[in-house]
Amino acid sequence: MNRLQHFLRAKTQFNLHSPFVYGLYTEVLFSRAPGAPRGRYEGALWRLERHYGVAADRRPDGEASFSCPDGDFLLLDHPHRREERWQSVMDDPRWQVTLDFFSYGIAVHNPRLSRQHFILR
């Protein structure tokens, strides 16, 4: 998927019907936090670590993961450059929710959530 296709299919917070994803989107990922790194992936990872008070396990291949009370999180930097890896994460039944922001992707393992894939701006 290229950036234009992603932009045309992507939704904003007003189209989110999952309370967990809406809260994650508005209160964590797009909060205005002073001191946040500039990059989208680094900024999202920094905000998640700060919100949940945990340090992520960062791998050199552009993936990071951590566990918290809301579940297990997996972040992928530039998932569309590694389309096979991102598709395998989306198809894996362990991950209930996947969030595709084009420049980074987030997968969440939380058995209380229904299985959904969100394409977001």
Which ranges hold each PLM region?
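A short alpha-helical cap/connector motif
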Residues: M1-F73, P79-R121
